[in-house]
Amino acid sequence: MITRPALARILASARERNAAVGAFNVILLEHAEAIASGAEQAGAPVVLQISENCVRYHRGLAPIALASLEIAKRAKVEVLVHLDHIEDQDLVREGVDLGVDSVMYDGSRLSYDENVRTTREIADLCHAAGIAVEAELGEVGGKDGVHAPGARTDPAEAAAFVKATGVDALAVAVGTSHAMVSRTASVDRALVSRLRDAVGVPLVLHGSSGLSDDELRGAVESGMTKINISTHLNGLFTRSLKAFLDERPDVVDPRKYVRLGRAAVEEETARLLRLLAA
């Protein structure tokens, strides 16, 4: 009997309930700890995301991936480890060998035909190992530091891409941009509904830090199933540290202030997961 990949299973369950799964990026070990603890507070599954930038920061995938996998294993709720925006196919293979739960392969910089070909190869590789695959058709706004809220995914092209590649989830451009520090973006809800009707797999919203709570709920109600958030949580983490050090510049033990960032991310993770599941 073939077991359905964990990410595909929890996304399908959320899609049936018109809810969404939160996927939050790991930067430091404390992020993984905070996100898993926040998920336990909310009683909801969560996805720990590791990007190529994170891999470069930690000078390799194994240190942060293995630590995240151990945190996930010890959690009292379902916590998955996911590789986010991976362009390096060798890194995908390393992730498969390490035992990650899912991969977002990003071939959006390639030509359409090459994107389809390489995404199909990655999907076949990962599915053989019981790992789910997310992909992207064309760039979501904000790549290379350029916000492009006008970018939109065509439903017919999205449906054809999913059929050709066999991916389990699709990241779509519906008005958000990566790395936004203000929550002022808006989602094209009508387009989300059209994409949900056209595409037979769960839809993924990248760049969700730029959305208010109302916009997040609207995106979920319109058909988004996986909500990626990073910058918003990083801002909370950083502001917590800065506030402490502004008052106590004499403190040199990093545990005394890094734990405040961890606590802030934990609290907001729990709140966001409850919002997405409402």
Where are these regions (language model features)?
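Alpha/beta enzyme core
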Residues: 5-17, 29-54, 61-78, 86-198, ...
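Residue-level signal for pocket-adjacent positions within structured domains
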Residues: 16-19, 135, 176, 206, ...
